Swiss-Prot record:
The active site is at E312. Residues 268-482 are annotated as: LT domain. This is Membrane-bound lytic murein transglycosylase F. Gene3D superfamilies: 1.10.530.10, Periplasmic binding protein-like II. Its EC number is 4.2.2.n1. Residues 458-470 have a biased composition (Polar residues). Residues 473-482 have a biased composition (Basic and acidic residues). GO terms for biological process: cell wall macromolecule catabolic process; cell wall organization; peptidoglycan catabolic process. Residues 458-482 are annotated as: Disordered. It is an enzyme of class 4 (lyase).
Length: 482
């Protein structure tokens, strides 16, 4: 009997111990929100990001950006609406993620062990590094030991952890964390000479250089690190699993490559002299022609039409080439006759005809090419002719690529100048490498116009807000005196 009693007591003790061990986890699972089911229930995916020219921005009243388009595709696979929530810096983003106010954070966020402990992470989809940026024509430091002036960073605790580690090697290293300005705003202040150094994400620096060529890179602070989306730390893995499946599919279908090409392809090319000349032209020459580009844009973005004109003539109405093309859109005699214009050097006639010709080229393309990509194919035809574009698409198909995909066709354009390929094509030799660069330049020029105006509008908004704040402070001071 005594033995039975002891066995019962032991069994009860083990049972209570087991409950004690299991209950906290079970309690957590029952009290912690399952984000995947919450997303399905509310019918929307909350994605936090940062407003800049790569991750997310508004263009012609529509949402754009690498992270926006990728998040939209993810929301579509979940069968829910996408709702973007915008923050000024990484810490604001992570604080809201920690509070479970957003479902994921997407802003080209670099991997850091501290953040990986704090949150779940999605698959890597890109890479970047931290770099020290300085103003061109200033002394370029060779390493952190040579930096004698203030280094500024945005509100980013993970970056600060990295700098604290570097401080062991460079004891004199100090930095200032600015919680009021975004990383992009700090880089703009650096370009204007208001601050001496900024440590920023290599992607953001390359993007800002396209409109602020005064920015220069001194050196990398860190090696390349993977870029991830971050998710709330949660005992449920449903959302993380769905994201893993989505990213794998985005890789296989080419979605990731297409987005990288669209938003990051142009920033890999940077020439100080060309960019500086172009920004001067945007400020001083474009305003006299922009009304015409807007007037005759048709179905195109007027800034794209302006970019084509800059690539063709640098916005010079009297431009002439040795081959006989003339005017701001550099039209041939045949094209001018086809478009029924009498004076190729008249800016209005030239812009109108150039736009109509581009629209005609777009109309000649097969419907199987997606709407967003049709313009890039048309620009190839504008540059080297419709026949050579047909050859490029046929060659792409012969080589196992997709003739309707710009990313695939663009890679094969240079092959039009190689005899082993053009000898097998209907229209023969073409300077396909020039057409490839032609389209890349136009994309870069267009993005620079878009982002130049975006930055100008943001600065105007900030100035107005500061003025309103100053007026309010003066009124409060006056009231206090009264």
């Amino acid at each position: 009997m005594k033995g039975l009693f002891l066995r019962i007591i032991t069994a009860l003790a083990l049972l209570f111990w087991a409950i004690d061990m299991v209950f906290p986890w079970q309690f957590l699972r029952h009290t912690e929100e399952n984000h995947y089911t919450a997303i399905q229930a509310r019918g929307s995916l909350y994605v936090g990001t940062i407003n800049n020219q790569i991750s997310y921005f508004i263009n012609k009243d529509s949402e754009r950006g690498f992270e926006y388009e990728l998040a939209k595709a993810f929301a579509d696979t979940l069968g829910v609406e996408l709702e973007m929530k915008i923050f000024d810096n990484q810490e604001q983003l992570f604080d809201e993620l920690d509070k479970h106010n957003i479902d994921l954070a997407a802003a080209h966020l670099l991997y850091h062990p501290k953040n990986a402990e704090r949150f779940q992470i999605g698959p890597a989809y890109h890479s970047a590094s931290w770099q020290l940026a300085y103003r061109k024509n200033e002394n370029r430091p060779k390493n952190l030991g040579n930096v004698k002036k203030d280094i500024y960073i945005s509100n980013n605790l993970a970056l600060e952890e990295t700098l604290k580690e570097l401080q062991k090697q460079y004891p004199q290293l100090i930095w200032k964390r600015n919680q009021a300005l975004t990383q992009e705003e700090l880089l703009l202040q650096l370009a204007e000479g208001k601050i001496p150094y900024v440590i920023a994400n290599s992607i953001d620096i390359a993007a800002i250089q396209q409109i602020k060529p005064e920015l220069a890179i001194a050196f990398d602070i860190t090696d390349e690190a993977n870029v991830h989306w971050y998710l709330p730390n949660n005992p449920y893995r449903d959302l993380q699993t769905a994201l893993l499946n989505f990213m794998n599919n985005a890789e296989e279908t080419g979605l990731l490559d297409n987005l990288k090409e669209k938003y990051l392809g142009h920033i890999s090319q940077f020439d100080y002299v060309d960019t500086r000349s172009y920004m001067n032209a945007i400020e001083n020459t474009l305003p006299q022609f922009s009304p015409l580009f807007e007037k005759y844009k048709g179905e195109l973005d007027w800034r794209l039409l302006a970019a084509v004109a800059y690539q063709e003539s640098h916005w010079n109405p009297d431009a002439t080439s040795p081959t006989g093309v003339r005017g701001i859109m550099m039209l041939t005699k045949n094209t001018a006759q086809h478009m029924k214009i009498s004076d190729r050097t008249d800016p209005e006639q030239s812009i109108k005809a150039g736009s109509e010709y581009l629209h005609w080229l777009i109309s000649q393309l097969p419907e199987s090419i997606e709407k967003e990509e049709r313009i890039w194919f048309a620009l190839v035809a504008y540059n080297i002719g419709l026949g050579h574009l047909i050859d490029a698409r046929r060659l792409t198909q012969n080589l196992g690529g997709n003739p309707d995909n710009w990313f695939d066709v663009k890679k094969n354009l240079p092959l039009l100048a190689e005899k082993r390929y053009y000898s097998q094509l209907k229209y023969g030799y073409a300077r396909g490498y020039e057409a490839h660069q032609y389209v890349e330049n136009i994309r870069r020029y267009m993005n620079s116009i878009v982002n130049y105006h975006r930055v100008q509008e943001n600065q105007t908004t900030n100035d107005n807000a500061n003025n309103e704040s100053a007026v309010k402070n003066l009124e409060e001071i006056k009231e206090n005196k009264d």
